[in-house]
Design a protein with these regions (language model features):
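Mg2+-dependent prenyl diphosphate-binding active-site environment of isoprenoid biosynthetic enzymes
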Residues: 1-2
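C-terminal, non-catalytic "cap/extension" segments appended to globular domains
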Residues: 5-136
């Protein structure tokens, strides 16, 4: 997706052939010889809906980070965070999303929400490992 945007920004035409060649080359690179990459994989990009919505995967990941920040604020029981979340809900899309999130105390223009989500993920991994150790 990033490479396709770079191609477009540099003035290169996005054709079936150019996108297929790029996708094929990326598959060869990513699989690194571990799998046979047949010629038909070059056309796989056409069936992936993510490519039809700009930076869908990045939006999904960043929205997950925002959701973690919002939910942890609510679950903490902090009345100010809960009130900020309620105010956020009342905005109803009247502002750009990044500005709306700031009203809820989540500043996506900083790395903090991503760092916090990764920390939370690490906590979940530790919980999972502890559960496995308890079972074993």
């Amino acid at each position: 997706e990033y490479k396709a945007h770079c191609m477009a920004e540099s003035g290169e035409s996005l054709t079936r052939d150019s996108l297929s060649a790029m996708y094929y080359d990326l598959n060869k690179l990513y699989y690194g010889g571990a799998c046979k990459v047949d010629k038909e994989v070059a056309y796989e990009w056409m069936r992936i809906p993510h490519f039809y919505n700009s930076f869908y995967v990045y939006k999904y990941a960043t929205s997950f980070c925002a959701a973690v920040a919002l939910s942890r604020g609510i679950l903490s029981g902090d009345k100010e965070k809960i009130a900020a979340y309620r105010r956020f809900l009342t905005l109803g899309g009247s502002m750009p999303p990044i500005e709306e999130l700031k009203t809820a105390g989540v500043d996506m223009s900083t790395p903090q929400p991503v760092c916090d989500a990764l920390d939370y993920f690490a906590e979940l991994i530790m919980q999972y490992q502890n559960l496995l150790n308890d079972e074993g």
